[in-house]
């Protein structure tokens, strides 16, 4: 089981695009690795179509997509062909064939009571090879690709500007598209913030809840 902040383990995998080395082949880029329970299943098909439709948006964020299941590479190839023939959507990203479950077990994608199939896991790995986000969905519930994109944008924004992002950013109920300034770490800076709030020099609910436009 891997944890947030850990390095993504080095591994060599077989995919529909040939052999890949993770995370080395994606050095300098972010990548989203997502597992699905099985090929030729309805929920997984809807997810793959949406990931493919949004693939260019991920690329614009310097991010590559990688699928994974415990199926054989031949099954992946035929399923990808089926998707294109029956939905008109081309799957542009590689899909890992983890038929022995080695990668899935190493990453904690196979959960108790679910047999040898993976749950719907999502790993977001940054351009330094560090695991930044992990999501798990049950086999019976499909993922929201827009939420994965939102989380990716939020992580990159936090890194670039040194801020935190609120619920549903950039459409938060309380502060709309504003970002959250890190809280004061000592009494002096907290008091300074209180004075700025009184003078209406900064936007805040309190000294520990300061927000601002991103730019």
From Swiss-Prot:
NCBIfam families tied to this protein: PRK13189.1, PRK13599.1
Active site: 44
Organism from which the protein derives: Caldanaerobacter subterraneus subsp. tengcongensis (strain DSM 15242 / JCM 11007 / NBRC 100824 / MB4)
Thioredoxin domain ranges (all copies): 2-157
EC number(s) from the headed UniProt entry: 1.11.1.24
Protein name (Swiss-Prot/TrEMBL): Peroxiredoxin 1
GO biological process: cell redox homeostasis; cellular response to stress; hydrogen peroxide catabolic process; response to oxidative stress
UniProt KW keywords: Antioxidant, Cytoplasm, Oxidoreductase, Peroxidase, Redox-active center
One Pfam family this sequence matches: 1-cysPrx_C
Chief location bin: cytoplasm
GO molecular function: thioredoxin peroxidase activity
Residue positions binding substrate: 120
Subunit comment: Homodecamer. Pentamer of dimers that assemble into a ring structure.
Subcellular compartments: Cytoplasm
Functional summary from the UniProt entry: Thiol-specific peroxidase that catalyzes the reduction of hydrogen peroxide and organic hydroperoxides to water and alcohols, respectively. Plays a role in cell protection against oxidative stress by detoxifying peroxides.
Catalytic activity: a hydroperoxide + [thioredoxin]-dithiol = an alcohol + [thioredoxin]-disulfide + H2O
Protein family membership: Belongs to the peroxiredoxin family. Prx6 subfamily.
